Amino acid sequence: MNIKLDKVSARHPAAKRDAAAALRGVSLEVSAGEQIAVIGPSGAGKTTLLHVLGCALPPSSGSLQLNARDPWRLPRSKLQLLRGELFLAPQVPPLPPRQRVVTSVLAGRLPHIGLWQSLRSLFYPTAIAQADAALARFDLSDKLFARVDRLSGGERQRVGLARALVTEASLLLVDEPLSALDPTRGQQAIASLTQAARERGATLVSTLHHVEMALQNFPRIIGLRDGELAFDLPAAQVTPERLQALYAQHLHELTGPAHEAFDLPAAATPPAVMHCR
């Protein structure tokens, strides 16, 4: 799916009137099949950008075009059809606790099948092999018929990502897919997502706190800070100096593997602290 943002600003409905917009004047273009990582400190507007791209939040100014169509100018019925071409994976996947994993994974197919088949699949899943194959990419085949409430936090996150592998959406929007995963599982998850998107020519946009993972796995990197576009560059051109400027006053978010990889000056590095994300 092709994407075009032209000077887009966005404000959350619950935000106070005098609060700054979560996104401010962001312009960018994405070609069908591109894979992009969005990085930046906490509160930079990364999740808001995904919500705008996923037609979950309308721009307060500027324009969004998906495949040369402004979704907010479409009739409601056509907007719903367009949303069926989008897949938004939130950081915490909304998985019903008593639901079987196979049903949760196959929920990714619901926008692409008929109403009757959707209802039937809630009780009698009909694409079990597809769900099993998706879970296998995340080493979760043994959880196919487990209940969601018996899973760990990391397993639930991987189940949410497995949905992206069964959907037929042409735009995958993935919010912080590694927040509950260790480095090994995180690399596995990113590899599975990028490979699946590449296989079917889908556009992939993912927000990431793990800067090193973003630079190693995505050819194009978008940096956001305070709701504004700081840079839009090939991964090879994202230098340590650019990262220091992007994360100024937030350098603790660069600690860990990404920090070591870029060998940031010790004088600029605050003491290491633990974060729960």
Swiss-Prot record:
Name of the gene: phnC
PROSITE patterns found in the cross-reference section: ABC_TRANSPORTER_1, ABC_TRANSPORTER_2, PHNC
Class of this enzyme: translocase
Presence of the UniProt keyword ATP-binding in the record: yes
Organism this protein belongs to: Polaromonas sp. (strain JS666 / ATCC BAA-500)
Compartments, record wording: Cell inner membrane
Domain ABC transporter residues, every copy: 3-251
InterPro entries given in the database record: AAA+_ATPase, ABC_transporter-like_ATP-bd, ABC_transporter-like_CS, P-loop_NTPase
Name assigned to this protein: Phosphonates import ATP-binding protein PhnC
GO molecular function: ABC-type phosphonate transporter activity; ATP binding; ATP hydrolysis activity
Keyword entries, A-Z: ATP-binding, Cell inner membrane, Cell membrane, Membrane, Nucleotide-binding, Phosphonate transport, Translocase, Transport
Highest taxon of the lineage: Bacteria
Gene3D superfamilies: P-loop containing nucleotide triphosphate hydrolases (3.40.50.300)
Subcellular location, principal: membrane
Catalytic reaction list: phosphonate(out) + ATP + H2O = phosphonate(in) + ADP + phosphate + H(+)
Pfam families (UniProt xref): ABC_tran (PF00005)
